[in-house]
Amino acid sequence: MFLLILLSFQDRVYVPNSNKLPSWELGLELFRDNVAWSQKYPIHRNLYGTLLTQIQIEREGAVISRSAVKSCIDMLFNLSYPMPHVAFSQRPSLYLQEFEPAFLHTSVEFYRAEAEHMLERGDAAQYLRHVERRFLEEEERV
């Protein structure tokens, strides 16, 4: 509790005049640089690959821990992309800058292949029902 009071005081008194980041934002940057986006241990690459794999296997019908995937994606939204000369609040998130392009690419590839396979069967009504089901699944995933 004492640490919270001390950091709150520091954020109110010291930070505005020093051109430094508030404690929370500084903590996020330190976590990003030293853990999640470490140059020594490429955790972020493993994380992106694992998230994409989990989403892929869920699309294929397996049950995954959606709460774990959501927690990781929320973390990527909260971590800003490192841009030293841009204000913290103006920086895009790691999700938008790095993960989303890979996610969209794999989604396009998956649904393109699935659509080609479904259309080869030639049943338009079944294809439309399948597309509607996929829309609902993706909406639930969000």
Which ranges hold each PLM region?
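Eukaryotic scaffold/interaction segments
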Residues: M1-V142
